[in-house]
Amino acid sequence: MEEFQGYLELDRYQQHDFLYPLIFREYIYALAHDHGLNRSILLDNVGYDNKSSLLIIKRLISRMYKQNHFFISANDSNQKKKLGYNKNLYSQKISEGFTVIVEISFSLQLVSSLEATKTVKSYNLRSIHSIFPFLEDKFPHLNYVSDVLIPYPIHLEILVQTLRYWVKDASSLHLLRLFLHEYYNWNSLITSNNFFFSKSNPRLFLLLYNSHVCEYEFILLFLRNQSSHLQLTSSGIFFERIHFYEKIKYPVEEVFANDFPASILWFFKDPFMHYVRYQGKSILASKDTPLLMNKWKYYLVNLWQCHSYVWSQPGRIYINKLSKHSLDFLGYFSSIRPNLSVVRSQMLENSFITDNAMKKLDTLVPIIPLIGSLAKVKFCNALGHPISKSTWADSSDFDIIDRFLRICRNLSHYYSGSSRKKSLYRIKYILRLSCLKTLARKHKSTVRTFLKRLGSKLLEEFFTEEEQILSLVFPRASYTFTFKKFYRGRIWYLDIFCINDLINYE
């Protein structure tokens, strides 16, 4: 990060709070094309390579230096033809470069904060799978859960004001307003899920979304830690901060006295309250009674409405009993089920049997939505019957097999934490047979004839990494028995940073 800091001359610009001049640097767009620093943001931009070239960037920067006002109304087609450029492409390029500049600024502030507090940064916690061991450890001991849809700000100017606490360059903020006006209806009073997770410029919208959510989560985390003695102890953290982790002398009570009525300002001690955020949603889970869960619900709604200026209705937040409710969580169906075990004990001449019931987190593959995703991309029909991928029939045999293998292994890799592997085997069966039908269609043959000619080597290619390891460790004779016995266990990986489109069926 220090190398990028010197290369991008951020020190010199940040002394005067200027980030705007960096938008004229060519290497900013090169970093945007390279999907961020150190591949920190793993987003697939399909077709991006066809649109990116040094000539386009040079032409774009030249137009900015000449102060050509190319952000014109989309209805003014005559002016657009006269200037002779693709307005949408240029505006997207500039917004991507702007996002990289702000990301670098945030990263440098975060690194300096971690160094000041001597906090060790764990890259393993970035993995999506890292949350599931936490749920396995905590959720079996909890009673109630609430799946909450995080509300959105009522106007886009709120997003700009949130970013203003971290970016003090007024020119950059005006440029951000221009992007929001281009990509979305600025006069709209209600934002939506489609806005924040739009595929037109995901990096910019995810940056705005995370900065918006980070504000209220920072407050929620602090008040959770101070819940039992908030009125007795004054804290030095001021939430309407200008810098990232600035601390000043105002106590928390003075800040929140203007935002919350007196009845909301008292809190209760709850050491079993857990909060998890994912894909625009959050989970509140607790061991307490429904009454205390309702208090947390109304507190959260008041926090959103009074401090973050978003509208949320308490009636849309449902509190469910964890033992009778399934969570649609990050591509898994998660629920708590009793795990019965029988223990035979013997004392002298008497023996007795004891039944022990322990709660366990059950993670299942959502087979119906996943088959729907496969049917949507033409690997099977709506009933789950494999069909040939006709659009891939013109590719070489190696490319066809490689594409199917990558999809199969990615799905197996992600769903390796499933409690039951049967559904996963069905998905792999669909992909295997779809691959065979695609190859048979290309060679104008039947699946049976093509499989006889190729042999069983093709099916062995679809083995996952776990199956390959077991086949190497154990002898071939005992492999089948060993595989069935040991492969039922769940495996969580710490290198999964993004969700495949097939898994993200929402």
UniProtKB/Swiss-Prot annotation:
The reply to whether Plastid figures as a keyword in the UniProt entry is yes
Q: Which GO terms describe its molecular function?
A: RNA binding
The protein's superkingdom reads Eukaryota
Assign the protein's first listed, main location to one coarse class.
plastid
Q: Which GO terms describe its biological process?
A: mRNA processing; RNA splicing; tRNA processing
* GO cellular component terms, semicolon-separated: chloroplast
Q: Does the keyword Ligase apply?
A: no
Keyword set for this entry? Chloroplast, mRNA processing, Plastid, RNA-binding, tRNA processing
The compartments listed are: Plastid, Chloroplast
InterPro entries hit by this protein? Domain_X, Maturase_MatK, Maturase_MatK_N
PANTHER family for this protein: MATURASE K
Q: So what family is this one in?
A: Belongs to the intron maturase 2 family. MatK subfamily.
Physiological role: Usually encoded in the trnK tRNA gene intron. Probably assists in splicing its own and other chloroplast group II introns.
Q: What is this protein called?
A: Maturase K
Q: Whose protein is this, by species?
A: Prunus dulcis (Almond)
Protein's gene: matK
